[in-house]
UniProtKB/Swiss-Prot annotation:
<dbReference type="InterPro" id="IPR040477">
    <property type="entry name" value="KDM4-like_Tudor"/>
</dbReference>
<dbReference type="InterPro" id="IPR047405">
    <property type="entry name" value="Tudor_PHF20L1"/>
</dbReference>
<dbReference type="GO" id="GO:0006355">
    <property type="term" value="P:regulation of DNA-templated transcription"/>
</dbReference>
<feature type="domain" description="Tudor 1">
    <location>
        <begin position="11"/>
        <end position="71"/>
    </location>
</feature>
<dbReference type="Pfam" id="PF02820">
    <property type="entry name" value="MBT"/>
</dbReference>
<feature type="compositionally biased region" description="Basic and acidic residues">
    <location>
        <begin position="198"/>
        <end position="218"/>
    </location>
</feature>
<protein>
    <recommendedName>
        <fullName>PHD finger protein 20-like protein 1</fullName>
    </recommendedName>
</protein>
<dbReference type="InterPro" id="IPR002999">
    <property type="entry name" value="Tudor"/>
</dbReference>
<feature type="compositionally biased region" description="Polar residues">
    <location>
        <begin position="186"/>
        <end position="197"/>
    </location>
</feature>
<dbReference type="InterPro" id="IPR004092">
    <property type="entry name" value="Mbt"/>
</dbReference>
<dbReference type="Pfam" id="PF18104">
    <property type="entry name" value="Tudor_2"/>
</dbReference>
<comment type="subunit">
    <text>Interacts with methylated DNMT1 (DNMT1K142me1). Interacts with SOX2.</text>
</comment>
<keyword id="KW-1017">Isopeptide bond</keyword>
<dbReference type="InterPro" id="IPR043449">
    <property type="entry name" value="PHF20-like"/>
</dbReference>
<feature type="domain" description="Tudor 2">
    <location>
        <begin position="85"/>
        <end position="141"/>
    </location>
</feature>
<dbReference type="GO" id="GO:0005634">
    <property type="term" value="C:nucleus"/>
</dbReference>
<keyword id="KW-0677">Repeat</keyword>
Length: 316
């Protein structure tokens, strides 16, 4: 085999170069060249975002290698991959903050993993990716010195010798005003209550207001008339103080049912005894009349039979 790599457009046969490789599952992945064996004409390819145990030796003229496709340009203004490390340390840029807005910043250092250590204009230091950094316009680079921290420049004059005036269109002032307005809105707004806290409040209110059961309703319905009766009756003699006894109307108190039933029974018994006495009188008169009638009949029979017996005796 040739000791020189072939000329394949879009692929640079160098250690660290990026390309796409086909794995054993017939899927393409972005990869990176780890080692090159010029004697055998093959390369050790590492699949990005995968463990090194999946690294594989592939011949440099294999169909399993192809140029890395360019990713779609993002709205942030990403350029070609060749401009990955286009920024330099100490350069003024626009860096993205957590609110997805870009603010003036300064690159402090460039890290090996492709990230940038950035210091914002208010002194906050963060580590950002390349996709979260934009180039600052040339006409705005001079205006940053009017609002930058003292550590950016003027180390010999800590009191602040940078007295550049701000224009009416200074976007840094606009950024600060927007940040102040956002802070005021945050402090002015009331804190939102979650749905769980509202549910807890409803539960507490339900605990205080219990719905009475059927048994409780019946018991209360029975007791309420008794209570009303008790309320109608006078509780003490204090209510009649200052009134004459003659003028006070007599109170008719309702009698209990037991006394009424006893009176009814007594009345029924008395009436029954009276009826019985009447019946006894009537039966006595009837019996006496019956006895008198029987005696008269016997006498008549005797008077009729006596002459007959005498005739029979005489005939004998």
């Amino acid at each position: 085999m040739s000791k020189k790599p072939p000329n394949r457009p879009g692929i640079t046969f160098e250690i660290g170069a990026r390309l796409e490789a086909l794995d054993y599952l017939q899927k393409w992945y972005p990869s990176r060249i780890e080692k090159i064996d010029y004697e055998e004409g093959k390369m050790l390819v590492h699949f990005e975002r995968w463990s090194h145990r999946y690294d594989e030796w592939i011949y440099w003229d294999s169909n399993r290698l192809r140029p890395l496709e360019r990713p779609a340009l993002r709205k942030e203004g990403l350029k070609d991959e060749e401009d990955f490390f286009d920024f330099k340390a100490g350069e003024e840029v626009l860096a993205r903050w957590t609110d997805c807005r870009y603010y003036p910043a300064k690159i402090e250092a460039i890290n090996k993993e492709g990230t940038f250590t950035v210091q914002f204009y208010d002194g906050v230091i963060r580590c950002l990716k390349r996709m979260h950094i934009k180039a600052m316009p040339e006409d705005a680079k001079g205006q940053v010195k009017a609002q930058h921290p003292l550590s950016w420049c003027c180390p010999s004059d800590p009191a602040g010798s940078c007295n550049q005036s701000m224009g009416s269109e200074d976007w840094i002032a606009l950024v600060k005003a927007a940040a102040a307005a956002a802070a005021k809105n945050k402090t002015g707004n009331k804190p939102r209550t979650s749905a769980n806290s509202n549910k807890d409040k409803e539960k507490d209110e339900r605990k205080w207001f219990k719905v009475p059961s059927k048994k409780e309703e019946t018991s209360t319905s029975i007791t309420t008339p008794e209570v009303e009766k008790k309320e109608d009756l006078p509780t003490s003699s204090e209510t009649f103080v200052g009134l004459h006894v003659e003028n006070v109307p007599k109170m008719v108190f309702p009698q209990p049912e037991s006394t009424l039933t006893n009176k009814r029974k007594n009345n029924q018994g008395n009436s029954f005894q009276a009826k019985r006495a009447r019946l006894n009188k009537i039966t006595g008169l009837l019996a006496s009349k019956a006895v008198g009638v029987d005696g008269a009949e016997k006498k008549e029979d005797y008077n009729e039979t006596a002459p007959m017996l005498e005739q029979v005796l005489h005939s004998l």
